[in-house]
Amino acid sequence: MSKEDEVSRIEANVEVIQGYLLSQFKGFELIDREDPPISYTFTVSKSPDERYLLKVSWTQLSDRTNTPEKTKQCLITDDVAGRMKGRSQGEYFWWKKNL
């Protein structure tokens, strides 16, 4: 596995997650931040009082068996947006899925 392949896979999976979050949190601003090799964080916010946070492990994003299609399906199946909304404001939802 080349470094370029890993970077491309991570970017593709991040784009899928961004699209999912923007579709589930209409009217919200999305900010994401990478923290390699640990995690990638996503913050969707409408105001300081309405903010939802998501963390995804770096290994989950880079795993070669984790295609963008699989990521999209798992986001829906795992109801990631609903679970993010179920957290207290300012508390991250750490999304881990079985690959």
Residue ranges, per PLM feature:
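Intrinsically disordered, low-complexity regulatory segments enriched in Ser/Thr/Pro
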Residues: 48-89
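Amphipathic, interaction-prone secondary-structure segments
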Residues: 18-58
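Negatively charged, low-complexity tracts enriched in Asp/Glu with abundant Ser/Thr
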Residues: 1-32, 64-81
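Short glycine-rich, low-complexity/disordered patches
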Residues: 22-38, 81-99
